[in-house]
Amino acid sequence: GHAYGASTDTGIGWAYKPDNGFAVSSNIGTKSNTSCKTTAHPCGTSGSYINTGFLTDESKTSWATQIGYTQPRYSASAIVNVKSNGWSDSYFKAGDVNGDAEARSNMTSVGLRAWWRPEETGTATPSISLGYDTTEYDTASSSQDTSSAYFVGLNWVDVFQPDDKIGVA
């Protein structure tokens, strides 16, 4: 899925976490096409490096907004991430995950996450983590205009001895 991702590029963000377990945050990151030594748009035909600026129509942009609720034994969150002009931060690839979408495609991703842990460790009951992402690609053909991914994780703590951890995903 494309909903979550990391970036060390230029950006700005904010978060609000009151003391009641709720949290909301939003951030925007942008990647200038300064590294495009190519003749493709927006670099032009000379193949020269061009600085496209911050938050311009030509810069790659990711805008993510997340809301969540956390308590000591459980948590749930949802994120919406709108990526434009070819922003990419995918970590896996089995062919072209964007199908036949243009390289400068826009996409909208939604991600859902939740976890729960038992009151006591050292039992047969594991903690559980769940996640689901779905992405819609604006310029892909109708047969390849969405993708989705999910995960399920189980984790046992202190089962055989203190501080041991066993996990399956």
Describe the predicted segments one by one:
Residues 1, 25-29, 77-81, 129-133, ...:
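Transmembrane beta-strands of outer-membrane beta-barrel proteins
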Residues 1-62, 96-97:
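Surface-exposed coil loops of outer-membrane beta-barrel proteins
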Residues 6-10, 59-63, 106-110, 144-150:
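Residues that define the transmembrane beta-barrel architecture of outer-membrane proteins
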Residues 10, 18-24, 63, 72-76, ...:
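Outer-envelope beta-barrel architecture signal
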Residues 23-27, 113-134:
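Surface-exposed extracellular loop regions of Gram-negative outer-membrane beta-barrel proteins
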Residues 28-32, 71-73, 80-86, 132-138, ...:
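Transmembrane beta-strands of outer-membrane beta-barrel pores
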Residues 132, 136-169:
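C-terminal structural cap/anchor segments
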